[in-house]
Structure formats: C-alpha cells, structure tokens
Amino acid sequence: VIDGRPQFLDRHLQRMLTGAKISDFEIVHYEEMGSGLVELLSRASTGTHRLRITASPESTLMTLTEFQGYTGEIDLGIAPWRLSQSRPLQMSKSTSYGDYWYARKWATEMGFDDALLLNNQEEIMEVSTANIFFLNKGEWVTPHENSGVFPGVIRSILLEMNFAKQVDLASAALSGFSACFVTSSLRLIQPVKKIDGLSIDNSPFMKDLHSLRQELESIAYA
C-alpha cells in the first residue's frame, strides 16, 4: 500500500478466493470486507505499508504494518533440503508456510538474504519469499509451474506480458545464466548478485530491469 493506495488489489483478492476454493471453504463476510478495508487504508494515507488479509472458514483478519521496502541486489543460498513439487496447497497462498519460513531463517543464519529452493527433481522452484527469473541465451525464463512454483502476482503479470516463458530449470544450469532477478508484490523487481557464491553480473541489464519496474508501477493500481 503506497500513500493509501493498495497495489494489485484485485489480483490478490482473486488469488485469495482461488486459494479458498482449493482448500474447500467459503470466506465468511467476503462482501462486507470492503468497508473494513476502506477504514484500514484510511490509516495509511502516507508512506508505504504491508497489507495482509488472512481468511479462514470462521473469520477474516486484516492487518496493516509499516514497510521499509527492499533495496539493492541480493545474495541467495541454495537450501540444503528439497521440496515436493506436488504438495496439495502449493498453488494457494496459505498459512502452511513452515518450509518457506524455515528456509528464510536458514538463509539469514548462513549470511544470505534469502534461500533458493529446489524440488526433489533438483529443479529450481523459487525463493522462499519470491519468484525468480533468469536470462538464458538472450531470453528471460522462469521455473515452470509444474516444478512446484507458487504463482505470484508479479510473476503472473510478467507471463501475461510475454516478458518471459516457463521452462523446467535444472539447478545444474545456474552457471549458464546471464542475469537474474526475483519478483514479489513487495519487491516488484530485485536483482540477484550471487547464488551460492556464484556471481551474477546484472550491470548490462540494469536499465532494462529499471524500465520493467517502472512498467509494473504504472499498472499497480489498475
């Protein structure tokens, strides 16, 4: 939420409805949520905030907290365990977040900014808090949803824009990528400078990434 205006709100609400359907429950008081949301947003008329809506069969909770934002390039470490690409709740954003929380905790303790997650086929999935994109032989690619990827909002937008295509990405291919960045609604676009000690030189593409970020900002409130 920037200066009281929520970004990509329609997409987040649709994803929440989809997640509830996958989990086989109806969100209580969904139609009345709007008035509560308006009141909550009135407290965030200036500055940047993180809005979180958590729905269950019994209740819906909305919270708003100040957010400082992400800056600079990040350093990723490959988590030492593998995740199943066929988890039943993988396609929905749920409170079943233990694997991702622990991966982020591990990364921080090891001196990384975040953890890169692989599935049990040794394929690249995502970062614990973001989706990931690579430049491969002049073409932007992102891990295929069949690898167990969570379908993030920014990832979906970039695919709709035909900016990148989904492919299966073996972890062994990491050394062959020319550039890398991660995406999330809180980050938009954030370059990756290292993965497990492997340096990535994004400098030739920073202008393009800046332009992409500006394009996302221009449609954030649509």
Locate each region found by the language model.
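Helix-start/capping segments and mature chain N-termini
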Residues: 1-31, 35-39, 43, 56-222
